[in-house]
Design a protein with these regions (language model features):
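Amide-donor transfer/coupling interface in amidating biosynthetic enzymes
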Residues: 1-121
Length: 121
């Protein structure tokens, strides 16, 4: 909590049950790098976490040079963020490694590797 006390689950508490687990739909902005990576505006990615971006910070991200480029279907949860005018920067709430394999790399990993190769040249 705000005082630093660790909350503990008890039989009569409602703590817990907040895990975002499994495939969740994410809507991508069309003018974003992630839209170019996936080549579509709606994706499903696997989650396993209890974390969310505080909605009070959304406007601050945009004014400080970050773009919210992926959100939940209801636009309540931030799923992906890019930095404006950066050749390749991406923050995401999901786990792209869950759906990547050696024969069929995840679009995020493929894009990152391609970008590093171009940058190195």
């Amino acid at each position: 909590d705000k005082t630093g006390k660790t909350e503990r689950r008890t039989a009569d508490s409602d703590l817990g049950g907040t895990m975002r687990l499994g495939g969740q739909t994410c809507i991508l902005k069309k003018n974003s790098n992630v839209f170019k990576m996936y080549k579509k505006n709606k994706i499903i990615e696997r989650h396993r976490h209890r974390y969310e971006v505080n909605p009070e910070f959304r406007d601050g991200f945009n004014t400080k040079g970050m773009n919210i480029v992926g959100t939940s279907v209801d636009d309540m949860l931030v799923e992906m963020i890019e930095i404006k005018n950066h050749p390749w920067f991406l923050g995401c709430q999901f786990h792209p490694e869950f759906t990547s394999n050696p024969r069929d790399g995840h679009p995020i990993f493929n894009s990152f590797i391609s970008s590093t190769i171009k940058t190195k040249k």
